[in-house]
Amino acid sequence: MRLSQMLFVTLRDDPADAEIPSHKLLVRAGFIRRLGSGLYAYLPLIWRVLEKVKRIVQEEMNRTGAQECLLPQLQPSELWKMSGRWDTYTESEGIMFALRDRLERELGLGPTHEEVITAIAKEMIRSYRQLPVNLYQIQTKFRDEIRPRFGLMRGREFIMKDAYSFHSDEASLKATYGAMDQAYRNIFSRCGLDFRPVDADSGAIGGSGSQEFMVLADAGEDEILYTEDGLYSANVEKAVSLAPDAKPSPFSGYKKQSAPNTATIAKMCQCLDCDASNVVKNVLYQAVYNSGKAVLVLVSIRGDQEVNEVKLTNELTKLAPHYESTNILSLTVPDEKEQQKWAAKPLPLGYISPGISDDYIATNKQVADKFLRLVDQTAVDLTNFATGADAVDYHVTGANWSTDFTLPKLVVDVRKALAGDRPVHDPTGELKTARGIEVGHIFQLGTKYSQAMGATFTNEQGEEKPLVMGCYGIGVSRLAQAAVEQSYDKDGIIWPTAIAPYEVVIVVPNVGDEEQMQVAEQIYTEFQAAEVDVLLDDRNERAGVKFKDSELIGIPYRVVTGKSLKQGQLEVVKRADKSVQNLAIAAVVPTLTAWIKAEKKTS
C-alpha cells in the first residue's frame, strides 16, 4: 500500500476525551475516530490489525474442531425471558439495547448469544450421536454502557468472538473447556501479548466455573491477585485467601459502653482502645430480586475486612428461589431516603448489632419482613469482640456468639481478598497484585440455559437429558487496543509483529530524488513478492514528518532510502528498540523476511 493513496491523518495533540495511553495513541495515529459516546469508526490501519487478530482466532478455533457461523444481532425478548435474563440485562445491569418493532414486539441488540444458540440447538440437536459440537462467530456486539470510556476498551459496540459448545455430559464439557483454554493461550501468545489466565466470577453469564485471560497493563480496570509460585491467580472479584490473624482481644465480659460520635470503625477502635480485628461490623444492604421483592441484608464481618459485593451477590442469588425469584436486580447500601420507605423507626447506623430486631422493618408487601442475616467466616472465629449496641453512641464489648448473639445460619465467604493476604494453598506465602485488561473469558455453563429453555437430547439409554453447555469469548477489538496499552513508548505504538497493520514501512526522505524512489519501488515490489505486508511512504512530506509518523503508527521495521544509499546500503530501524543497521540493498528483503517469519513463529 502507498501511503499517498491511504486515508491517513495523524494528530499532534492528545484527544481531550482520552484517558489512557492506548486510547490517545490510536486516535492520534489515525487508527480510530470517535463518532459519539462509546462509538468509534475502525479506519484502514486498525482494520488490518483486527483482520490479523481474527485470522489467528479462526485458525486456533478451527484447529479444535469448532465451526464458524453467524447469528442474528437482533434477538427476540421471548428467548431471554425463557432464560430469566431479560430483566437482568434490561433493568438490573441495563446493558442491553432494547427496542420495539412496528408490531410492538420486544427485541434486544445482542450483548451475547447464549439464548439464541440454545434455541437453535433445541431444534437441531436430538441425539448424543450429534455431540459434542462447538459453534463460534466473530461479529459486532452491543452494550449500553453507563459510562463508555477508554476507546475500544469499553465501548457501546465492539467486535467479539463468542463460541458455544454442547455436550452429553460434564466430562465432555471439561474436555472442550480444556481445549478452549489451550486455544486461548495459543491465540494470545501468537498475538504477542503478555497475559495471565485467572480464576473469575461467572457474573450474569452463570455456570459452575470460569476463567479470564488478562493482558497485564498498568491501565487495566481489573485487579489480579496471584502467587509468585504460579499456582494461584484470580480476579479480585473471585479471589480467596486466608485473612490475617486477629489481634488478641483486650475485652473480657459483656459490657455496654458509651462511645459518642464513633459511627466508623476507626473512631470506634480509637475510643475503645482496640484493633479493628477485634470488631464485628454489621453492614446493611438492600437487595431487590426480579420478583420485585426487596430484602434487607445484614452482613456481619470482621472489622478490618471489606465485603466483596460480587461474592455477596452470588450468595444472594442462590437464595433467590426463597423470594420467588431467579436473580437480583440491584444490591445497594440504602441511604436515608431509601430507608424511609421501609423503616418502622430510624436505624442506629454505625451502631447496628448482629442481633438487631426485625421490628425495625415496617409492614410492606414489597419488603421482606425479616433481615436476611449472613456472617463471614472471619467474624465467626472471633471471641470477646466489640460490636454495635443498636443504640446511637453505644457499642458493646466482650461479646460472644451463642451467649450474647445468635450466630446466623448462613456462614459465607464474602470478604474481599487483598494483596499481602496469605494464599490458601501456602499459608507461608503472600498474594501479589497486578492490573489487567480482560481479553478473554471461558465458562462451564452446565445446564443453566438448556434446562430453562428445554433444550434436550436423547442419551445412549434412550433417556431425555438437558444439553450440557460451555461458552467462550474473546474481545477482538479490545485485544487490539490492549496490545497497544502493553507496548508503546513516548513516540508512539509498538505493534507486535504478528498483528501489526504492516510489517515494514519504506520511507523515502526525498520523493524528488530519482534514485531514492527507484530503489524504494524496487524493494517495495520485492517485499510484496515475499508476501511481507509493506507500506511505502511516498508522500511529498519532510523526512522528519515521515519518521515521526512511522514511529507513531508503530510498524515493526522501517527501511530508509537515505544517505547510506550512496554506499549501496539502506538504513533499517527496528521500532521496538530503535536499533539501526545498514544492510546491502540486495540483503534487505531476505533479511527482514527472515526476521519477521522468526518473530511470528516465536510469538
UniProtKB/Swiss-Prot annotation:
CDD domains of this UniProt entry? ProRS-INS, ProRS_anticodon_short, ProRS_core_prok
**What molecular function does GO assign, one term?**
proline-tRNA ligase activity
Q: Which PROSITE patterns match?
A: AA_TRNA_LIGASE_II (PS50862)
Q: Which reaction does it catalyse?
A: tRNA(Pro) + L-proline + ATP = L-prolyl-tRNA(Pro) + AMP + diphosphate
Q: Which residues form the signal peptide?
A: none
Major localisation: cytoplasm
Pfam families reported in the protein's UniProt record: HGTP_anticodon, tRNA-synt_2b, tRNA_edit
Highest taxon of source: Bacteria
- GO annotations of cellular component type: cytosol
Q: Which EC number applies?
A: 6.1.1.15
* Oligomeric and partner information: Homodimer.
Question: What family, per the record?
Answer: Belongs to the class-II aminoacyl-tRNA synthetase family. ProS type 1 subfamily.
Looking up HAMAP family in the UniProt record yields: Pro_tRNA_synth_type1
Written domain comment of the UniProt record? Consists of three domains: the N-terminal catalytic domain, the editing domain and the C-terminal anticodon-binding domain.
Q: What is this protein called?
A: Proline--tRNA ligase
At the highest ranks, the source species' classification is:
Bacteria, Bacillati, Cyanobacteriota, Cyanophyceae, Synechococcales
